[in-house]
Amino acid sequence: MKRKLFLTGPMGCGKSTAIAQALGAKLEKAGGFLTRRNGRDRLYFTLESPDGSQKATFLDFRGDSPRVDLSVFDSLGAKLLTGDFLVLDEIGGAELLEPAFMEALDRALASDIPILGVIKAEGPAGKLMDTLQLSEAYLEASARLRRRLAEDEDTLVYTCGQFDPQARLLAENWVKEYCP
């Protein structure tokens, strides 16, 4: 089993669920972060530590126009990228444009720390760019991250289908090997 496992695929296909179910109570021992979708009609997204003790809103659709605070990734996100193993759920969004966060992410990816994560699929990445009116630099950063993961011999990026049992099995096997 490769030290770094990332699940990707369409929104709502069960990537985060597979990771949460595979980790169970071990999730609270992880370093890294979770991005949480909150609300029903008026959405907002928070960045949270896996144990839930630290959180901050970084994207809010509750007003007339989306409010984005990517500094949350530089201040909180970068700080959370330490631990015996990391959960990164999810990367590949606008946080790729935040320098301090990207430095911390680069260090984590270059390290021997086991990582279990979700990487935003290319289609949703393009939609995010349009919705938030991000520059072309975002698509370039997204492509650079995908290339880096694809070229790393110690990383597996698995594309999930809808509620893919193989995704959960991969996550469970990763947990058995890398989580104390």
What are these language model-derived features?
Residues 1, 25-27, 79-84, 109-110:
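Flexible, charged surface loops at secondary-structure boundaries
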Residues 10:
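P-loop (Walker A) phosphate-binding loop of NTP-binding proteins
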Residues 15-16:
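Conserved lysine of the Walker
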Residues 32-34, 88, 117:
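A structural signal for short, well-ordered beta-strand segments and their strand-loop junctions
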Residues 48-51, 71-79, 177-178:
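N-terminal export/assembly leader peptides and their processing motifs that target proteins to secretory
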